[in-house]
Amino acid sequence: MERVDVAIVGGGPAGASAAHAAATGGADALVLEKGVPRADRDRLGPDSTDAAGILDYWVDIMGIHPDEFDDGVVQRELNRAEFRGPDEAATLTSTGIESSYDGFGYTFQRARFDDWLRDRAEDAGAEYRTGVSVRGVDTDLSVDPSDGPNGDAGPDGRGDPRHVVELASGESVGADFVVLADGPQRTVTNRVLDEYLPADAAASERLASRTANHIAYQEYRRVPEDVYEAVNDALVFWWGVMPGETAYPWIFPNDDRVCRIGLTMPIGLDIDEFDRDAYALLDPDDESIPQGGEYIRRLLEWQYGDEYDVEDDFPLVEDAGKRNGTETYPISSTRPIDSPTDAGVAVVGGAMGTTSAFHEGGDHVAVRTGAIAGELAAAGDMAPYNRRWKEAIGDEIVRNVTMADMVADYEPADWNRIIGAADAMLAAETGDGLLAQPYRSGWESVKLLLGYKWNKRRVMKDYVGIDESEYVY
C-alpha cells in the first residue's frame, strides 16, 4: 500500500493550497483529483468553475498577491461593483476595508489560477495525481501518528496508517492525515463525516446537494465594444429580477472583450410559488423556472436587445469554459462546518461551506482554509484547525451569512427599497470604513444599518452548520 503523510481529496484551490502548505512544512503530500476536461485547459484538472473575482481585502485573506501569478491569470483590474435592482441602482467604489492591494479588485481566469496553484504545490514537493476517484476513507482511531511507528513498520520505517483512502481502481493509500477538499458536492466528505455523527444528524442529509447548494450557470460571450467599455472594470450584479433566495445574474469581465455572464439560484424552485409578473426575467406564460441559458438570453435582451441582435452581437466563445463556452456548477449556500479534527480529518473550502451565497466569492477562503489544514498536517497536529479557520476567516463568514440571512425573503420591491438606500446596506456589508455618513439616505438607511448590526451580533454567536462538539469518536 502506498503511504503518505497527508492525503488530500480534491485538487481545487483548497486542495492545492493544502498540498503546498503541507509540502512546504516537510510533509509527504498527495493530491487525489478525479480530473475534469475543460475547453480552456490542455490537461485534466479540477472543475475550475466560479465567477472568478477577488476584492481588495480578499487578497490578504487568501495570502497571495496577484503579482505572484503567471501571466494570463489576472484578467481585468476593477474599480467598482454595480448593484442593479428592478428600478434602482447603486455603485460601490470602495470596500472600506484596509488591504495590501491598492485597487478595488480583479477578475481572473479560473483554470489558469488553479493550474498555478497546482504548479506551486508540485514545486514545493507535493504530488498532484489526476484521473483518480476516491471511493471512501477507512480510519483506525486507535492509531496516533504522534506515537511514531506502530504495528508492523514498513520499509520506510512508518507503522500502520491512521487512514486508508480507498480508490476506485482498487488501490489504497495510507495517510496520517486526510484533508477533504472535494467541493460543494461533497461526494467523499459527507460519507466520511457520517462516520462521526449520530444517524439522526448525518452530514449526508444536512449537507445534501439539493438543499445545501445553489446551482450556477455562466456563459463566456464576446460583447460589443461599447458594452465592454461600460463593464470592463466592474462587477455587475442584478438583484430582484429572478425568483429564489439569493438568486441573481451577473456580468464579470475578462480580457479581449469577453465577459462571463452568469447566474446562481436555489435548486428545485417551484415557479407557482412566485408572482411571474413581479420578476423582470420571468414571462407570464412560464410553466417552470427557466434554464440557465434562457435566463441569460432574457437578461441580454432586457439590457441590450433594443440596440443589438443578442445572438449575433454577443457570440459564445466556444473554446472557453468547460464546454462550448458554457459551464454549470454547484456552489455551497450553507453555513461553514467544523471538522472532526480528533480523527485527523480537516474539511476545507467549498466542501466545508465557506462560499458565500450572497456574492459567490469563495476562492480566497478556500485557499486560506486549505493552507491552514496543510500547515497543521505537516506539524502533525490537526487539533487547532477549527479555531484557526475561525480566526482567519470568521469575520468574512459572519458578514456573508448576515447579509444572506437578511435578504433571504426579499422580493423585487424590497430590492428596489434596499438598493435605493444603498449607502447603509453596502457600508454594512463591507465594513465600518464606509460608515462615516450612515444616515444620509434617511430613515430607510438607518433601518438597514441597525438591522445589519443586530443580525450580525446574532450570527456571530452561531454561524457554524456542524459544530465540532457534535462529532462522536
PLM regions: where:
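C-terminal helical "tail/cap" subdomain of flavin- and related membrane-associated enzymes
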Residues: E375-Y473
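An active-site-proximal "capping" alpha-helix that borders the catalytic cofactor pocket
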Residues: I8, A18, G362-N386
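N-terminal Rossmann-like FAD-binding beta1-loop-alpha1 element of flavoenzymes
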Residues: E2-V31
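N-terminal FAD cofactor-binding segment of flavoenzymes
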Residues: A21, G25-A27, V36-E88
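Predominantly flavin-linked oxidoreductase catalytic cores and closely associated redox partners
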Residues: E122-E307
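Core beta-strand elements of the Rossmann-like FAD/NAD(P) dinucleotide-binding domain
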Residues: E2-V4, A168-F177, T341-G344
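Short beta-strand to alpha-helix junction loop
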Residues: G96-D119, E287-G292
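FAD/FMN-dependent oxidoreductases across multiple families
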Residues: G136, D275-T369
